[in-house]
Curated annotation (Swiss-Prot):
Quaternary data: Homodimer.
Sorted UniProt keywords: Aminoacyl-tRNA synthetase, ATP-binding, Cytoplasm, Ligase, Nucleotide-binding, Protein biosynthesis
Protein's cellular compartments: Cytoplasm
Any Pfam family hit: tRNA-synt_2
A GO term from the CC aspect: cytoplasm
Protein name, entry field: Asparagine--tRNA ligase
HAMAP family, per database record: Asn_tRNA_synth (MF_00534)
């Protein structure tokens, strides 16, 4: 007898009227008299099986009837269209092999009932199997894929910065120290300084990798370990990377809408919010942002009055971004609240040539970027002002000594982008295994 071809559930519609085999897990099981309705999952979707007692052997019927949740199985059956079934297709099961049966005396811990977030995070290694969490991770995968696609099409070269570094990228952030064979080292906060070097070799570069910040923050937007995509462009000024950033975000959103629409529906995302995203993005100066916040305070919409010179906090970003239906770019923050390497505005030395991109719906900053300081002397002075060790930055200063050019770049936190695009309340669901202030397990 000819063996049935193996299919994924996502592509089951290509086999309508045929016998196929799927490999996956029992997601749920419903019994109705002499009918069994097992629902299988394989990482690409759900498929409802059907077993009518009189049409199958007693052994097969009992085998399926006694299956436990999340037991791994190999299932063969005939596919047919059924509008009422999840995914629009059903399988009349003709054979089933149990790969590993979850024991009845130690059942799968995440049952269909409601569970608290601490319980779910403690069982994150299993929680990722739920339809909602799997959909979020597929959307995350598409965001990463489309990011690589965008920069590849734009002629960028992927270059990998080190994860172990001898110094801080930004002196204001807390570092995770590492003993490097007796010498002090740190887990990277950003690949930016290193890709500034590769930009001087290759022109247009980007990096993608993990970053670490030991900030004792418990907000819904902070992780201690997260992933960033960071482009850097030689001979580019602030306006150039602002244009690059809005094109980049628009590309990602359109890719997710095109390729992961079903997953967005699974997590019940309002698609109209994403379909509005297109260039150009609104642009406001820091001064205009301050005015918005002060007016919000006057109306009683914000508790405290924001004063010029402060950095925008999460409540400030949330307030401003909630006023727009697409990402908004805030540019030219005060020099004092930004990193040492940012170029001051030649028309106003109190502000830096920098930009933050705030996602709409109150999600706040997803991108931070700037034009980098070009003068060796000014950069050296800034390093001293920030009380950073000059010796650690000698190589970075060399970039201004040997053929320095105007250059600019930005960084986008993948998890914050996932949170916004998926409409999530907290970044802990945006990454397979979140690392937060009080969680490093599993």
């Amino acid at each position: 007898m000819e063996q049935a071809p193996v299919s994924t559930i996502h592509e089951i519609g290509k086999h309508d009227g045929q016998s196929v085999t799927i490999k996956g897990w029992l997601y749920n099981l419903r019994e109705s008299g002499k009918l069994l309705f097992p629902i299988f999952r394989d990482g690409t979707g759900l498929l409802q099986g059907v077993l009518f007692k009189k049409n199958v052997s007693p052994e097969l019927f009992d085998l399926v009837k006694n299956l436990t949740q999340e037991s791994s199985v190999i299932v063969t059956g005939n596919v047919r269209a059924e509008q009422r079934a999840p995914g629009g297709y059903e399988m009349d099961v003709t054979a089933l092999e149990v790969v590993q049966r979850v024991p009845e005396n130690e059942p799968y811990p995440i049952t269909p009932k409601e569970h608290g977030i601490e319980f779910l995070m403690e069982h994150r290694h299993l929680w990722v199997r739920s339809q909602r969490q799997a959909a979020i991770l597929r959307i995350r995968g598409e965001i990463v894929r489309s990011a690589h696609e965008f920069f590849d099409k734009q002629g960028f070269t992927l270059t990998e910065p080190p994860i172990l570094t001898p110094a801080a990228c930004e002196g204001t952030s807390t570092l995770f120290p590492v003993d490097y064979f007796g010498d002090p080292a740190f887990l990277t906060q950003s690949g930016q300084l290193y890709i500034e070097a590769t930009a001087m070799a290759l022109g247009k570069v980007y990096s993608f990798g993990p970053t670490f910040r030991a900030e004792k923050s418990k907000t819904r937007r902070h992780l201690t370990e997260f992933w960033m995509v960071e482009p850097e462009v030689a001979f580019a000024e602030l306006d150039d990377i602002m244009k690059l950033a809005e094109d980049f975000i628009t590309h990602i959103v359109k890719s997710v809408l095109e390729r992961r629409r079903d997953d967005l529906k699974t997590i019940e995302r309002d698609l109209s919010k994403l379909e509005n995203i297109d260039t150009p993005f609104p642009r406001i100066s820091y001064d205009e942002a301050v005015q918005m916040l002060q007016e919000g305070h006057a109306k009683g919409e914000l508790e405290s009055r924001f004063e010029w010179g402060g950095d925008l906090g999460s409540p400030d970003e949330t307030y401003i971004s909630s006023k727009f239906d697409r990402p908004v770019m805030i540019h030219r923050y005060p020099v004092e609240v930004k990193a040492f390497y940012m170029e001051p505005d030649p028309n106003n030395s109190k502000v830096a040539l920098c930009v933050d991109v705030l996602a709409p719906e109150g999600y706040g900053e997803v991108i931070g970027g700037s034009q980098r300081m070009g003068s060796y002397e000014k950069l050296l002075a800034r390093i001293h002002e920030h009380q950073l060790p000059e010796e650690s930055f000698k190589w970075y200063l060399d970039l201004r000594k040997f053929g320095g050019v105007p250059h600019s770049g930005f960084g986008m936190g993948i998890e914050r982008a996932v949170a916004w695009i998926c409409g999530l309340d907290h970044v802990r669901e945006t990454i397979p295994f979140a690392r937060t202030l009080h969680r490093i397990y599993p």
